[in-house]
UniProtKB/Swiss-Prot annotation:
<keyword id="KW-0012">Acyltransferase</keyword>
<dbReference type="GO" id="GO:0005737">
    <property type="term" value="C:cytoplasm"/>
</dbReference>
<keyword id="KW-0457">Lysine biosynthesis</keyword>
<dbReference type="GO" id="GO:0008666">
    <property type="term" value="F:2,3,4,5-tetrahydropyridine-2,6-dicarboxylate N-succinyltransferase activity"/>
</dbReference>
<dbReference type="Pfam" id="PF14602">
    <property type="entry name" value="Hexapep_2"/>
</dbReference>
<comment type="similarity">
    <text>Belongs to the transferase hexapeptide repeat family.</text>
</comment>
<dbReference type="InterPro" id="IPR050179">
    <property type="entry name" value="Trans_hexapeptide_repeat"/>
</dbReference>
<dbReference type="Pfam" id="PF14805">
    <property type="entry name" value="THDPS_N_2"/>
</dbReference>
<protein>
    <recommendedName>
        <fullName>2,3,4,5-tetrahydropyridine-2,6-dicarboxylate N-succinyltransferase</fullName>
        <ecNumber>2.3.1.117</ecNumber>
    </recommendedName>
</protein>
<comment type="pathway">
    <text>Amino-acid biosynthesis; L-lysine biosynthesis via DAP pathway; LL-2,6-diaminopimelate from (S)-tetrahydrodipicolinate (succinylase route): step 1/3.</text>
</comment>
<dbReference type="GO" id="GO:0009089">
    <property type="term" value="P:lysine biosynthetic process via diaminopimelate"/>
</dbReference>
<dbReference type="InterPro" id="IPR011004">
    <property type="entry name" value="Trimer_LpxA-like_sf"/>
</dbReference>
<dbReference type="GO" id="GO:0019877">
    <property type="term" value="P:diaminopimelate biosynthetic process"/>
</dbReference>
<keyword id="KW-0220">Diaminopimelate biosynthesis</keyword>
<dbReference type="InterPro" id="IPR037133">
    <property type="entry name" value="THP_succinylTrfase_N_sf"/>
</dbReference>
<keyword id="KW-0677">Repeat</keyword>
<keyword id="KW-0808">Transferase</keyword>
Length: 271
């Protein structure tokens, strides 16, 4: 994989020197090999190592090169035709059952996204570079953006959106860690991290500029929701007191033992 990384990095530095028609065969093959590694889960855009998330920038480079070098083409989706650069993930009748993933009609997964066994897709959309781990449910009309990392046993409720982050290359993707619940119509975007075991209420919107207020500590932070947080939508007064600004409010933090004994609705109502 080291050789592949070197080829991709060098190609990205010279990406303006070739087009769909002129891309060298060696680079074309390296791009496709990288996309295949992402597609089968051997390579991830981001990995947690020693408690820290690290981004594989070269894998992002490969995706951007894939967009640049692939021609638009028509392909058959069974009930209709699409015209795009990136094919769908499941292209034959044998690959889907072998994957161990349940895919309800009208769910869309692009090539280069990985779904672990025992995941369930209701009619939803999973973009290239995304990683969805085992036991996770992607509910109706939920979207998982490019390169987003979704942990084990996560529930993305109806209409929830997890934003994609391809550029800048060094930016972390949006990350939802294991055992999280993301409420209906909530949006987690711009590389925000929701740590393990957190519960996000319906209609919570969190980007890098969204204040995250911890009711217990009275601290305001940005870009990260700590493990075990129970979060609801709210607002904070402006500095001049003339208006209120939308905020995500951490009403409490719970451990796994508490969460296992208490329903999600109870946790949110107690806030």
């Amino acid at each position: 994989m080291t050789d592949l990384k070197t080829i991709i990095e060098e190609a990205y530095q010279n990406k303006d020197n070739f087009t769909t028609d002129t891309v060298p065969k060696k680079i074309h093959q390296a791009i496709h090999q990288t996309i295949e590694l992402l597609d089968n889960g051997e390579l991830r855009i981001a990995e947690k190592q020693n408690g820290q998330w690290n981004t594989n920038e070269w894998a992002k480079m490969a995706i951007l090169l894939y967009f640049k070098t692939e021609p638009l083409k028509t392909f058959d989706a069974g009930y209709t035709f699409f015209y795009d650069k990136i094919p769908l993930k499941y292209t034959n009748n044998t690959s889907q059952p072998q994957s161990g993933v349940r895919v309800v009609p009208h769910a869309i997964v692009r090539k280069g996204a990985y779904l672990a066994p025992n995941t369930v897709l209701m009619p939803s959309y999973i973009n290239i570079g995304a990683y969805v781990d085992s036991g996770t449910l992607i509910d109706t009309w939920a979207t998982v953006g490019s390169c987003a990392q979704i942990g084990k046993n996560v529930h993305l409720s109806g209409g929830a959106g997890i934003g994609g982050v391809l550029e800048p290359l060094q930016a972390h993707p949006t990350i939802i860690e294991d055992d999280c619940f993301i409420g209906a119509r909530s949006e987690i975007v711009e590389g925000v991290m929701v740590e393990k075991g957190s519960v996000i209420s319906m209609g919570v919107f969190v980007g890098q500029s969204t204040p995250i207020y911890n009711r217990q500590t009275q601290e305001i932070t940005y870009g990260r929701i700590p493990a075990g947080s129970v979060v609801i939508p709210g607002s904070l007064p402006s500095k001049d007191g003339h208006y209120n600004r939308y905020s995500a409010i951490i009403v409490k933090q719970v451990d796994e033992k508490t969460r296992s004994k208490v329903s999600l609705n109870e946790l949110l109502r107690e806030g």
